[in-house]
């Protein structure tokens, strides 16, 4: 189940994933990195997303997936990401979020950056991300750092998006 945007857990900073012991669930069971990857991938695809963070399904650890929901083989796992270098060039572009259904707003983000992270197999590597993939990656990384979707937008863009969502909801009610 996807956690809605007003859930206070989305404002918490997630703890690093421990590959040696896995993630301990509330019921005491242990979740492996591989199992978490497949859980996230399944939820992302089911919700037609391009990224999903563990905290968005109530698992407060530093992990997410990104990829194209129409191509399951494109989905990659990201565990314990750390930005290495960030380009100063930025671009403003519209974003949405699975935890905020129907809400789209313009957000300013760096065009490219270099990051180090591990896959679900625990193997770490460094990669450069650019363009749309960089935007999705940083959006999911914000979730891990407790930074909410709407806090990244300017006040103007937030008001504009909120008004548009209200208008769409009114139209749906009368349809």
Regions found by a protein language model. Give the residues of each.
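Positively charged
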Residues: 1-175
């Amino acid at each position: 189940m996807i956690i809605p945007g007003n859930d206070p857990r989305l404002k918490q900073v997630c703890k690093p994933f421990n590959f040696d012991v896995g993630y301990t669930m509330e019921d005491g069971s242990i979740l492996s990195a591989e199992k978490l990857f497949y859980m996230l991938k399944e939820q992302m695809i089911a919700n037609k997303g391009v990224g999903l963070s563990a905290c968005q399904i109530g698992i407060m650890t530093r992990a997410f997936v990104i990829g194209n929901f129409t191509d399951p083989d494109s989905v990659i796992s990201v565990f314990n990401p750390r930005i290495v270098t960030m380009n100063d060039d930025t671009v403003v572009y519209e974003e949405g979020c699975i935890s905020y259904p129907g809400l789209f707003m313009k957000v300013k983000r760096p065009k490219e950056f270099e990051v180090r992270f591990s896959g679900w197999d625990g193997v770490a590597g460094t990669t450069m991300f650019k363009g749309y993939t960089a935007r999705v990656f940083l959006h999911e990384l914000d979730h891990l750092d407790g930074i909410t979707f709407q806090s990244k937008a300017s006040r103007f863009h937030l008001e504009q998006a909120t008004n548009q969502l209200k208008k769409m909801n009114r139209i749906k009610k009368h349809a």
